[in-house]
């Protein structure tokens, strides 16, 4: 902060790690006290508490994650681990439906920790 004051440059905290609502509130207040701007990420996350709202995880989502984590360095390997496409489309369609705000779960504790009205 001495550098900030000496050089007349604003400080900004662009992103922090995931923590508890209590930690987030404490850190946010500390930043506010010393006039450091901040951003907490993200607005929506899949089945998580550390975001403004949580997107419900669709049944079968792990199949997509497993495919993405599999060795796909050769076409033969891709074909070997490739999941059923109609099932993947169904899972992704459910995911897109779940992303609609009306289907998300608000994380009131997270919002309150940021000093906002949930």
PLM regions and their residue ranges:
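Substrate-binding cleft of secreted/luminal carbohydrate-active enzymes
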Residues: 3-117
């Amino acid at each position: 902060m001495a550098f900030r004051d000496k050089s007349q440059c604003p400080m900004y905290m662009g992103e922090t790690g995931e923590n508890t609502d209590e930690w987030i509130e404490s850190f946010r207040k500390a930043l506010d006290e010393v006039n450091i701007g901040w951003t907490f990420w993200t607005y929506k996350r899949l089945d998580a508490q550390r975001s403004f709202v949580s997107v419900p995880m669709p049944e079968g989502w792990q199949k997509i994650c497993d495919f993405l984590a599999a060795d796909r360095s050769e076409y033969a390997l891709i074909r070997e681990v490739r999941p059923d496409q109609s099932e993947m489309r169904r899972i992704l369609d459910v995911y897109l439906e779940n992303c609609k705000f009306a289907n998300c779960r608000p994380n009131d504790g997270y919002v309150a920790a940021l000093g906002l009205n949930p």
